[in-house]
């Protein structure tokens, strides 16, 4: 954070003069000299203050600069620039501009008049406005597809204005030299480019002008430079694009691999068509009478045919098969029907044969014939655009088995990679968000300090002027009496006390009607002042400084100091947006307190209007009004229509009356301060306007505004409120992003129109049979915009084919891919990221702090209480009549206490008037009723359960104790009148008393009621197995029927008990459970055989019927056994047992029906399908599945909540759709061609009916999915929201005219806007909410189960994770190097990293050669590729052979080697036997693709690939969870496919149902359901189900092979089936998949952000293996230094490292060896730093390692490195000390001998050394033996070999002057008692150091 702002005030602003320039130059010189002087004291470099950046507003603290200084050059106010040549200019709006003080363009100095004029123009607000208007006008002109002649002149004007702008900028700033000049701002490059292009295209002829004109569209980007805030969003986008690089690389790589697989599997397949056969031509048919053509023609054998036919020139076979007339086309299809020659591929109809002919489907663009097209097809699959079409084409041509390929691509490619992009964008957004929050927080802290300073200065004055705030009479800061809770703090911000706890808003005052008008008025005014203190939300204030607002808000909400609040109020008054006169006007005209009677009347109105019952009534009216609007349909009777219109009038009246009375009760001034009231007033006004304009044509859309009343429900429905808030917040936050998106859409729409518009016009016949422009084209701006919008929705491929056909493939691909990647993958994902960030755990459990919600609860509470009283009264009356004594409440069973009874609860925070009814009876005669003042007893206040805010009346002790603290703040309420104060004291006492006893209620307030924190529960343990059976029946049953109480100790009872024990033993046995699971799986599998062919397979049918009886019998036996074993009580309290019971019942019923002959009854058939639920029970036994199911069940409430909210949200669009389109989708069609009659022939229904009677060829039909009523509207909206079948709804909508009129092509074009708006709000928002809800739910459930790391700090978690990773690994024993010389050399060669990389490069080259392959390639190319492939096989075989030779049998210990070996064997076999393998299996080239997996190995070697490794790691982490979800999904598909088979097997084959994709067999059902799991094509499967009567279907249709008649569908069943499947699979299960990926990506990201990761430990192990060749897990201490140096960062300890290694204190075992775990722990600690808490962690990791590695038994340390070093040092110190001691003794003795020789010895002096070694030797040296002395002297003069310290041994240093040298021979004997030397003691040393 930059330094604190300079001292505030205007004295800081000084004119920029020549003197200022001189000062800057002087300072600059000083700064240049200063570094040389004090280089060593350099602090961190200063940074510019972010608050004073150019373009920012001047911070408030500076005040307003004097007017004469505005717009003139001033000295720079940022201290950072004091020594730089810059100056600033501040505009009238206090915006800062910074300029370079060097002469602009070397000519204009800062003091030049021209430059000053240019600056004045540049900073003027009108200048930017002019530029903005110019850009927008220019954009409007660019949207013209056929510009008028004069537009050229306008173009010149625009260019002129842009040139003028650039000139002004250059003159004021300079061109490019120095900071803050024109070209130093990257945004100005854009301007420069645009202007340059304008002049270049004008003066230089560059050919294709329209392509160059598209450059003009970049001018739209200039809006980004002009609108503040857009630059930051663009920066965020660029940031996320940078972060996406890794994902993009991974995606491209994965797509390339899949494309290669696709290329090998499906090359040429999509050209197999059905050709008419036999040939009608006689000459040809003679040729083909051979037997070959009685079978199907094999794929590519047409060549010999052509050779055969060459001789016969009259018939050209190629031309015959290429001719479209000889190919089989389905009705309405542009492409011929595909077919295949494998058994499960599509078959040709009679008279046709499957051959390869013609081009590929979709203009030839959909194919796998070359790598490029295969890649495009895979990209399409990954983005899931119209992929069902590709899926169906491929399966039809290649066979249904290949569904597996699509499953893999959809799950890995689509779900995983696309959502990784979302995860990355979300993370980038999140990081930026956190950074900005951090910045704001720092700013606020800084501002707080400044504010403190200000406050101290002004305190005395403030306290004097605002004393009224603290007066006794004043209202407390805790609430407001005037309005209902709507008047409370906006955004429901609770007030807080000094501890940050919420202050209750409760004001207990007996509601009295006697309060005088004056008091009322005074109180109201005081409240308003407090209200305004707490509402610093004025826009003016916000504009000046966001941080002030936040600081002010935090000061106000702290509510610790009234003085601060007063200061802030003054501050606010200064910043009020309106002049004071308006406030005076408001006081006079908008606060209605004219006379006392009026005030009393007003209070009565307030009392009534604000009553909870009125709220309840209004809510009921809203619901009824919504129902009335939803009842509109087509066709309606007149009576019904009249009823609806009357209803509308009534509701409009009710809502108008509510608004009117609220205005009276609250005064307009306060009424319009509440958001909901403004919302109400707008709707009421619009409703009234609509009544007036009811008959005006075209204004019926006003009726739609009434629908917004539905949103009023949000006041009383937290989830809807949350949704609206989230959308509100997002739209607010998205304001800038939406603008960016709009600019992107605009630019691409214009680019498309400019580049391709002409081509669409000229080449239209290529894509349209009638040569009219199709609906999707780019010839004008609106249609071009629609295409771009459609691409944003994810549908790009179909429009791109059209574009490629008319305008060429290259350009279209570039433009469409850019829109797709930039618009869809980046910007839309940023939308979603923003939406997800709006979610937090609190959002879904929205607190009840919304006033209106309490009102509803109170009203419902009263009703409940009334109902309970009535019930009790009636029961009492009946009992008295019957002569019984009514039960006293006191005697009630404690268990039932609180159910519907009044109970002591926390009192609601009700304002004065709300107390009128609900709590009035608490306060009777100045004492709270229900409060006993007996000191002993606990005290409660009666309140109806429903009236409480809290959902959970009894809290835990802890919570209550906490509450005591927070709620003591109630004493702030002593601002009330004295009478209430007394009561209040009691109430406080009450509260404290209540807190002592569990379950008693707090009386003070529940405004701060938080639901108790979810307890950290341990995951439910499996209940311990019961040893014997429990009781059969519950205690109540036994009480009621005593005969059930059996004595089990004797007689029959004992036998019964033994029987139960036996059954229990059987049931509890593992084998029993396994057997039952096996039976369940078998019975489920049996269901899959009951398809439409069952009647033809009599044997199978008989077997299945018999098996069904057996299964039923087994399950009944199982159920009975369990009843006997467990008893009814246990059995029927288990949900899985209930499921079992339900399924067994179904089986029994259907079996009984079969035996009685009722098997053909519809209900019985439906019941049979419910047997498909059987697998659920088996899967309840699988742990993984159960986890997913539990998670799902946990999420169901939230999912339903959101589903309900979505339905309400969609209801508005559905009703609007009914208003706009009901009855308008009907059309008159030609029954033979299914084409529409033009309006010139048929104008309306009556014309059509007449034509039908005349010719029988016309029919008046409706579109199947329409808006004729709200339910159908919902279906339409679901199709639009999933983007499936939405075209079939949009086209009739834009063609519609009026009810019962024939539609006309695009006559109602702007109806597209309805769909665009719905897609944005109904699809982008609400569907993505599901992801938000599910992710949020997962996180909440995690919290509930308790993260295992709750009790660890962040640092410890990192440590823990690191430890976890390294504990699970151990170094492997490396493969020993062979003793043989040649083998050894080869071993060294293949162990090199270079060898690995070389092989990887070869693999990649091999892939490249595969990519070059195409369908129908020339023989020469084929031959060349074959040879290259053989060469590669030889190389890889060579690699394999070398490894086998060098590694011997160890080769097979590595998984990768085995993998390589198998691939090589398969490749060789594939080359040799390619024809046989291809005929019976898949193409052998696939084996080469498998080799790509090896590239995964190289990722570890590349440092830059860490990001990609993270992504793959995230995938690996997700796999187990994804497998569980996959299982669940399969289960759902299984159940639905069985259900589909029994209900939709015989529907008419049309739309999406055909011979291959249908519900006739289990296989084809599963294929259809897999397809619609991604919501693809579900609309086409639904359409045939909607046929219910002729002529759409034929009820008498004969289905061959069965006795089932008819091919009509069941519309209701179809809609329920498909909608429920879409919601369950597409919205819930698939989103769980996404949630897991996002979660794991975040985890992986955190892990990769850790200092140490998995790879570092692997690298450690690999390095260790090189040093510990025996795999002993120990190395020599002497090797440690080299080992630590050989490690890679971050674990490396570089040389010289001896000292650091010793300090690590590593344990040594016998033989000075060190264990790997010790070294690893030590280097890890070096990286992470040392903390005390890690001791326990180390112990646990060592224990874990010992567990994993039994080899470490010998791991018993005897010393450590530090200890060893200490011992060495100790030895040296002892030796030195002993030597010094000997020197001293020697010197004493030598001096004595010398004195003896010279005769100076005193007579009484004795020899110091009388006996011992020293005396003996010195006697020998100095006593008598002179020769010996000379010899020693000679020895002394020899040079000494040892000079310096080495290790722990220190050698003698050279002698110093003035030292007497006494030669002493010290032998081993002499050193006997010294410390042991480190290595070996020298036998002879000469002692030289003698200090005298």
Curated annotation (Swiss-Prot):
Residues in domain IQ? 1767-1796
By its UniProt entry, which InterPro entries does this protein fall under?
A: EF_hand_dom, Ion_trans_dom, Na_channel_asu, Na_chnl_inactivation_gate, Na_trans_assoc_dom, VGCC_Ca_Na, Volt_channel_dom_sf
Q: Which cysteines are joined by disulfide bonds?
A: 274-339, 348-354, 765-771, 803-812, 1228-1248, 1593-1608
The molecular function GO annotations come to: calcium ion binding; voltage-gated sodium channel activity
Q: Where are the III repeats?
A: 1052-1366
Report each IV repeat as a residue range: 1375-1673
UniProt repeat feature I, residue ranges: 107-433
Look up keyword Transport and say if it applies: yes
Q: Which residue intervals are annotated as intramembrane in the UniProt record?
A: 371-395, 781-801, 1271-1292, 1562-1584
Q: Which reaction equations make up its catalytic activity?
A: Na(+)(in) = Na(+)(out)
Report residue spans for region: Important for rapid channel inactivation. 1350-1352
CDD domains given for it?
A: Na_channel_gate
Which spans are transmembrane here? 126-144, 152-172, 187-204, 211-227, 247-266, 403-423, 613-631, 643-662, 677-696, 699-716, 733-751, 813-831, 1072-1089, 1103-1121, 1136-1154, 1163-1181, 1199-1218, 1310-1331, 1395-1412, 1424-1442, 1455-1472, 1486-1502, 1522-1539, 1615-1637
Quaternary context: Voltage-gated sodium (Nav) channels consist of an ion-conducting alpha subunit which is functional on its own associated with regulatory beta subunits.
- Domain-level remarks: The sequence contains 4 internal repeats, each with 5 hydrophobic segments (S1, S2, S3, S5, S6) and one positively charged segment (S4). Segments S4 are probably the voltage-sensors and are characterized by a series of positively charged amino acids at every third position.
Q: What family does the entry list? A: Belongs to the sodium channel (TC 1.A.1.10) family. Nav1.4/SCN4A subfamily.
Protein's name according to its UniProt entry: Sodium channel protein type 4 subunit alpha A
